[in-house]
Amino acid sequence: MMITLRKLPLAVAVAAGVMSAQALAVDFHGYARSGIGWTGSGGEQQCFKATGAQSKYRLGNECETYAELKLGQELWKEGDKSFYFDTNVAYSVNQEDDWESTSPAFREANIQGKNLIDWLPGSTLWAGKRFYQRHDVHMIDFYYWDISGPGAGLENVDLGFGKLSLAATRNSESGGSYTFSSDDTKKYAAKTANDVFDIRLAGLETNPGGVLELGVDYGRANPQDDYRLEDGASKDGWMWTGEHTQSIWGGFNKFVVQYATDAMTSWNSGHSQGTSIDNNGSMIRVLDHGAMDFNDDWGLMYVAMYQELDLDSKNGSTWYTVGVRPMYKWTPIMSTQLEIGYDNVKSQRTSENNNQYKITLAQQWQAGNSVWSRPAIRIFATYAKWDENWGYSNTSGLQTKDSSGSGAFTSSRGDDSEVTFGAQMEVWW
């Protein structure tokens, strides 16, 4: 009995140690940015984006506090088989006060099971809400291939010459479908589901240091029983993507070609809006972007893109953008960055153009000497000059020429310029 009692504290200590180790196994990842800024003409920091463009050059041009907080843990592992639970809660506020309340967005909650299928080694079976294999241009915060949402799939199936991924995800539109009530009046659904089915083949070796990824997405509206879509709704659509990635100069270059039709043209990224009656048409995008660390002194990010959205409603546009962000590294933790970006958006309906130049100079302290090193604290000054001749009508939402020159009746910003300055932190981990 004495021996047993003496062993008891040791057993308790071992058990506590095991429990502590399990608790420490929780993975904490995320992203956040926040800061303070001012506008030269007075007031808080303004941010600048060309009307009709889908993104903006972000250095010294972000006016919100935004964060994504991810918690995950491997819940079970036996040999090479495992289950991993992943979550993500995101929020955004306007950087106006100490206390700013907001409703957080539950962006991810999924289980990923690796090597569960013996005859498909290396594959991952997953289900739940997820950021699914997103492709983006960091310097303009632009996601050009993104079907994220609730879904399920099987990814990274090794075919020998490449890896195959299959997925189905969903996003919903407000209203969009209707039925008839007892008095023959239309009763609209609160939401109408849109389903996207995604097939990708990645890791196709094309040349030394170069790989190709090919994908096709089909999206369609899926109204509930006894509900129908409005006349003229696009109902469904396709998007095809080809992306070549080249390892070069301590970084990468990505060349992308995409083509989308009808319901897949609304977001131009892989989300479907099949209940819409104004998105029949097509989209073509040609994109080249990259990021490189040439040596201990210089780094670079860049983007060039052409996108043409041709809609039957004549509410499409032609958008092209080009920008560079060179980085000079004074020390391993201090650098200077200069971002120069230009956007031009031509209205399909009015044939008028909106354009904007934006230049930012930033002094930065970061955890390392790479263009990707974070955390970072930067002080910045931004100059933006724009000349806009069309906007979206405040009443109809259609593109219209801005005759007021001040955007009084449209979203046009007229012809003007502005200077902002401030400080910002950015971190991912």
Curated annotation (Swiss-Prot):
Residues 397-416 are annotated as: Disordered. GO terms for molecular function: maltodextrin transmembrane transporter activity; maltose transporting porin activity. It catalyses: beta-maltose(in) = beta-maltose(out). Induction: By maltose. The record marks Y143 as: Important in sugar transport. It is found in: Cell outer membrane. One of its GO terms (cellular component) is cell outer membrane. Keywords: Cell outer membrane, Ion transport, Membrane, Porin, Signal, Sugar transport, Transmembrane, Transmembrane beta strand, Transport. The record marks Y31, Y66, W99, F252, W372, W428 as: Greasy slide, important in sugar transport. It is a multi-pass membrane protein. It holds the Pfam family LamB. The keyword Membrane applies. GO terms for biological process: monoatomic ion transport. InterPro entries: G_neg_Bact_CarbUptk_Porin, Maltoporin, Porin_LamB, Porin_LamB_sf. Its main location: membrane. Residues 397-412 have a biased composition (Polar residues). Involved in the transport of maltose and maltodextrins. Does not act as a receptor for phages. Belongs to the porin LamB (TC 1.B.3) family. Homotrimer formed of three 18-stranded antiparallel beta-barrels, containing three independent channels. This is Maltoporin. The gene is lamB.
